[in-house]
């Protein structure tokens, strides 16, 4: 983070399982001789992970005194909780109190989060919960010395395999466009605490995962096809025969998807939204389920 390095140890390395997660934090200021200058970030922006029931100390108002931050949940025998309780500077805030603006209210089977500091000195809690069907839900709160403010929420997930830096991090979202999958975009945190992206499309297949969404057509399909590394819309219409193999690459999350062909070219799917009487969209007037082998 901008303040130092935190080392997390596997279970049983320092203590028994019952002792919980073991971690050691090394501050750049307190231990300048341990960390070379070129590896010190020295940024006013930072993000640190915070697990359920873990306590972190953060100076929320810049007065030099650190406030205690944590969150907890009253879980049933199936590990399900109706809401999350955020503990901030001795006060407790149940996410159920934000139900008017956040219907989901933080319920789920698990929770994980990050404390995020932005350039303007404000501190945010990025709280992710996982509900039915492993659906991820990201809620953002502003943490203040005497208050917690709900900012926004969306069906997004923090990629645990990628570093979380306020200037660049990865969020995922589940889609049902030509298949069911998670796709990713790179984001940064704005000064209002809300993640913003410059990416126009969500990435389905990338360096973030080896998993692929593959399709094989069951009918001849007329699609726009272009060379790799060229702009969307720059291709030509081409009839691809039944049996063509596609690997999905990107989507706009609504009615557009890109796939790579076996010869390396890119084809574009423009989807027609279903009517009120239909449950699925169409491609060139044909129901999606009739376009591919399943």
Name each model-derived stretch:
Residues 2-5, 105-225:
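Short aromatic loop motif centered on NTY/YTY
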Residues 9, 17-45, 199-219, 279-294:
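Sequence/structural signature of beta-propeller modules
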Residues 14-26, 30-40, 85-98, 139-155, ...:
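Surface-exposed loop/turn elements that mediate protein-protein interactions on large endomembrane-trafficking
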Residues 56, 235-236:
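Short, conserved secondary-structure segments in the cores of folded domains
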Residues 59-61, 117-118:
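Calcium-coordinating acidic loop motifs
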Residues 64-68, 122-123:
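Glycine-aliphatic tripeptides that mark coil-to-beta-strand junctions in extracellular
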Residues 229-234:
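Short alpha-helix capping/helix-loop boundary micro-motifs
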Residues 236-294:
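SH3/SH3-like beta-barrel superfamily modules
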């Amino acid at each position: 983070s901008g303040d130092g390095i935190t080392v997390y140890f596997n279970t049983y390395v320092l203590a028994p399982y019952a002792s919980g997660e073991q971690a050691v934090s090394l501050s750049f200021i307190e231990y300048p001789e341990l960390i070379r200058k070129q590896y010190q970030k020295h940024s006013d922006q930072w993000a640190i992970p915070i697990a359920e029931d873990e306590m972190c100390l953060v100076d929320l108002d810049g007065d030099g005194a650190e406030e205690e931050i944590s969150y907890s949940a009253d879980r049933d025998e199936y590990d399900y909780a109706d809401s999350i309780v955020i503990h901030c500077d001795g006060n407790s805030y149940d996410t159920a109190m934000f139900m008017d603006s956040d219907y989901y209210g933080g319920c789920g089977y698990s929770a994980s989060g990050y404390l995020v500091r932005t350039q303007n000195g404000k501190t945010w809690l990025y709280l992710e919960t996982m509900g039915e069907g492993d659906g991820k839900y990201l809620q953002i709160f502003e943490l203040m010395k005497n208050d917690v403010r709900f900012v926004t929420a969306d069906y997004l997930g923090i990629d645990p395999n990628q570093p979380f830096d306020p200037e660049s991090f990865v969020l995922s979202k589940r889609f049902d466009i030509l298949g069911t999958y998670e796709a990713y975009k790179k984001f940064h945190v704005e000064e209002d605490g809300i993640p913003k992206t410059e990416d126009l499309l969500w990435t389905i297949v990338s360096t973030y995962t080896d998993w692929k969404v593959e399709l094989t057509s069951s009918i001849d399909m007329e699609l726009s096809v272009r060379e790799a590394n060229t702009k969307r819309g720059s291709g030509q219409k081409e009839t691809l025969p039944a049996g063509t193999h596609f690997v999905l690459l990107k989507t706009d999350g609504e009615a557009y998807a890109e796939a790579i062909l076996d010869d390396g070219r890119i084809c574009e799917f423009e989807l027609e939204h279903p009517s009120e009487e239909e449950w699925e969209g169409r491609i060139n007037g044909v129901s999606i389920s009739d376009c591919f082998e399943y």
